[in-house]
Amino acid sequence: MDVTRLLLATLVGFLCFFTVHSHLALEETLGDDRSLRSNSSMNSLDFSSVSIVALNKKSKKISRKEAEKRKRSSKKKASMKKVARPPPPSPCVATRDSCKPPAPACCDPCASCQCRFFGSACTCRVLNPNC
């Protein structure tokens, strides 16, 4: 009995070890590390020098203003992209009102007549608010 428990404990330990080991990132070998260092030093010589320029207060204010203008224009474009909905039919049922089958269609084009309790209680509901 103790031998089987010992074997099961060993098996569980190995399974845990292999599970953790399989999820760890693979480490680079020394040979790969040397080749990476030599490649990175050669590649760094290929790039041109970069100069860092400090911004003054006026340029910061201008960039903020430009960013605000861009944000406003993008909001306006997003609001303009909405497609105009067709006008509702003249005899129509408002949202959340009763719309039993002989009743006319729902006023909201995104709403549909949804019936519950075996068709005894029907109401106009908007199923997709992003319609």
Curated annotation (Swiss-Prot):
Glycans are attached at residue 39. GO terms for molecular function: melanocortin receptor binding; type 3 melanocortin receptor binding; type 4 melanocortin receptor binding. Keywords: Disulfide bond, Glycoprotein, Knottin, Secreted, Signal. Transmembrane segments: none annotated. It is found in: Secreted. The keyword Signal applies. InterPro entries: Agouti, Agouti_dom, Agouti_dom_sf. One of its GO terms (cellular component) is extracellular space. Epithelial cells of the hair follicles and the epidermis. Residues 92-131 form the Agouti domain. Residues 58-100 are annotated as: Disordered. GO terms for biological process: adult feeding behavior; epigenetic programming in the zygotic pronuclei; epigenetic regulation of gene expression; generation of precursor metabolites and energy; hormone-mediated signaling pathway; melanin biosynthetic process; melanosome organization; melanosome transport. Disulfide bonds join 92-107, 99-113, 106-124, 110-131, 115-122. SUPFAM superfamilies: Agouti-related protein (SSF57055). Residues 70-84 have a biased composition (Basic residues). Its main location: secreted. Residues 1-22 form the signal peptide. PROSITE patterns: AGOUTI_1, AGOUTI_2. The presence of a 'disulfide through disulfide knot' structurally defines this protein as a knottin. Involved in the regulation of melanogenesis. The binding of ASP to MC1R precludes alpha-MSH initiated signaling and thus blocks production of cAMP, leading to a down-regulation of eumelanogenesis (brown/black pigment) and thus increasing synthesis of pheomelanin (yellow/red pigment). Causes hair follicle melanocytes to synthesize phaeomelanin instead of black or brown pigment eumelanin and produces hairs with a subapical yellow band on an otherwise black or brown background when expressed during the mid-portion of hair growth. This is Agouti-signaling protein. It comes from Mus musculus (Mouse).
